């Protein structure tokens, strides 16, 4: 899932 405050979380 993508984090609103951390868009890069989507890449992981």
Swiss-Prot record:
Which keywords accompany this UniProt record?
Amidation, Disulfide bond, Pyrrolidone carboxylic acid, Secreted, Toxin
Q: Which tissues does the record link to its expression?
A: Expressed by the venom duct.
Q: Which GO molecular function, any one, fits this protein according to its record?
A: toxin activity
Q: List the disulfide bonds.
A: 2-9, 3-10
Source organism's superkingdom?
Eukaryota
Modified positions (Pyrrolidone carboxylic acid) in chain numbering: 1
- Residues carrying Isoleucine amide: 12
One term under GO cellular component: extracellular region
**Major site of localization recorded for this protein:** secreted
Q: Does the keyword Nuclease apply?
A: no
The entry's localization annotation reads: Secreted
Assigned protein family: Belongs to the conotoxin T superfamily.
Q: What is known of its domains?
A: The cysteine framework is V (CC-CC).
Name of the protein = Conotoxin Vi1361
